[in-house]
Design a protein with these regions (language model features):
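FIC/Doc superfamily catalytic core
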Residues: 1-193
Length: 193
């Protein structure tokens, strides 16, 4: 909600070719999508690819999800919100294929932190006859980093829970009180208000 420049553009296909993708810092044009006239056929092909259950050649679901992301971002069919939609479809496809852990990965944060590398992977793919190996490689690394972030988060939360549980053994205190005792234990000079 409230992520588009103009909320009336939600879900609307482009009706012209007055669109370019710019680097948010330098404002350099990094991508000019194909003509809006190609959008109707693209949508048919895109939906066929997305929903293909019996392909002639196997494409691993993670790779297919990345290709879905690339296809939508490359075509840029919507007036606004193409990047967010591409990432959302990637997540949705992964969940549809049974990769439930994807729901807990923050790939968007990794892309945000490495926006220039993300854009370069796109540019290299375009410059090399749409060889999306660059984009796939970037996204696999982003998935790996996101997974490591999730592992570290779980490790921190598990350790915090373990420490709080130790203080719960004191008796006659609840979990919130145990957390406060833990804060004082770890930082004796901490001032809580």
């Amino acid at each position: 909600e409230n992520t588009l420049e103009n909320n009336e553009d939600a879900g609307r296909f482009r009706q012209n070719d007055d669109v370019v993708v710019e680097n948010s810092i330098t404002h350099e044009v990094v991508h000019t999508p194909p003509s809006y006239k190609e959008i109707p056929q693209f949508i048919v092909d895109f939906c066929d690819f997305f929903n293909c259950e019996k392909a002639k050649h196997f494409i691993h679901p993670i790779i297919r999800g990345v290709i879905i992301h690339f296809m939508l971002a490359y075509m840029h069919p919507f007036v606004d919100g193409n990047g967010r939609t591409a990432r959302a479809l990637f997540y949705w496809y992964m969940l549809k294929q049974g990769y439930w852990l994807t729901e807990y990965l923050s790939i968007s944060r990794i892309i945000y932190k490495s926006k220039l590398t993300y854009e370069k992977s796109f540019l290299y793919a375009e410059a090399d006859n749409n060889d999306i190996g660059y984009f796939i490689n970037y996204n696999l690394r982003a998935l790996e980093l996101s997974f490591k972030e999730l592992q570290n988060y779980i490790k921190r939360k598990t350790e915090a829970k373990r420490t709080s549980t130790t203080f719960l053994r004191i008796g006659n205190i609840n979990e919130r009180q145990a957390d406060i005792i833990k804060i004082y234990y770890q930082n004796p000079k901490e001032m809580l208000t």
